[in-house]
């Protein structure tokens, strides 16, 4: 926060980090991959969770199976991890997905090569996928980190 962060994201569920974020009123998204971790996060008061690593963990099918028993809680997921333009729409179509993260648009190699036009093109493609998905599902993702 001292450096200007408006929210935080982690790959795992670390209770000390969650409590520090809570003390500073920092919107924070702990990482989960199992039902036990979802249950633990919910018991600690967190309803916006990073599903990581999404694709290696089983992708959309795994997230649907993981989310189903918790549907009554209002939990929302932010899948990240090996997601690409080819899988973006599948995640966005899920009602329990608040947002999707992906590094394919600005990967380390592209940044190191200063491939700004490629990064811009990949980001524009992702935004088109988002718009098409919203038009198809009739839903927009109105997600605000603070709640």
What are these regions (language model features)?
Residues 70-73, 133:
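Short helix-capping segments at alpha-helix termini
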Residues 21-23, 109-141:
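C-terminal helical cap(s) of enzyme catalytic domains, especially alpha/beta-barrels
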């Amino acid at each position: 926060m001292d450096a200007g962060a408006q929210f935080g994201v982690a790959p795992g569920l670390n209770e000390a980090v969650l409590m520090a974020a809570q003390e500073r009123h920092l919107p924070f998204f702990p990482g989960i991959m199992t039902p036990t971790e979802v249950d633990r996060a919910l018991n600690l008061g967190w309803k916006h969770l990073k599903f990581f690593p999404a694709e290696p963990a089983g992708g959309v099918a795994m997230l649907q199976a993981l989310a189903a028993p918790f549907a009554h809680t209002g939990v929302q997921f932010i899948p990240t991890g090996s997601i690409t333009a080819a899988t973006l729409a599948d995640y966005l179509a899920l009602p329990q997905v608040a947002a999707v993260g992906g590094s394919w648009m600005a990967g380390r190699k592209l940044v190191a090569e200063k491939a700004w036009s490629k990064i811009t093109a990949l980001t524009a493609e992702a935004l088109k996928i988002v718009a098409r998905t919203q038009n198809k599902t009739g839903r927009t993702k109105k997600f605000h980190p603070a709640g």
